[in-house]
Amino acid sequence: MSITTERKQQLIKEYAITENDTGSSAVQCAILTERINNLTEHFKSNHKDHASRRGLLILVGRRRRLLNYIKKNNISEYLELISKLGIRKVK
């Protein structure tokens, strides 16, 4: 259910701006998206897990705020990121 260290390192390599970049907004959005996707799969078999559903909503809100920040500062980076992650635009 949780994201593995290897998968996190792979996401950091893929979305990092520089080699040692682990905290940029794009990297954080990619990691949050992976966690959200894992929780979504979890809910397919555990639909009554309401405590985890609250955690999912918190993660989605955190990702939405990060995407709003990226959209406000660099619209081209935002459009590229949402297409790579396969998510819809933030309203």
From Swiss-Prot:
GO molecular function: rRNA binding; structural constituent of ribosome
Transmembrane segments: none
SMART domains (alphabetical): Ribosomal_S15 (SM01387)
Pfam families reported for this sequence: Ribosomal_S15
Example GO biological process: translation
One GO CC annotation: cytosolic small ribosomal subunit
Record flagged with keyword Ribonucleoprotein: yes
Keyword set, alphabetical order: Ribonucleoprotein, Ribosomal protein, RNA-binding, rRNA-binding
Function: One of the primary rRNA binding proteins, it binds directly to 16S rRNA where it helps nucleate assembly of the platform of the 30S subunit by binding and bridging several RNA helices of the 16S rRNA. Forms an intersubunit bridge (bridge B4) with the 23S rRNA of the 50S subunit in the ribosome.
Assembly and interaction partners: Part of the 30S ribosomal subunit. Forms a bridge to the 50S subunit in the 70S ribosome, contacting the 23S rRNA.
Family that this chain belongs to: Belongs to the universal ribosomal protein uS15 family.
NCBIfam families assigned to the protein according to its UniProt record, in alphabetical order: S15_bact (TIGR00952)
The protein's name: Small ribosomal subunit protein uS15
Gene that this polypeptide is encoded by: rpsO
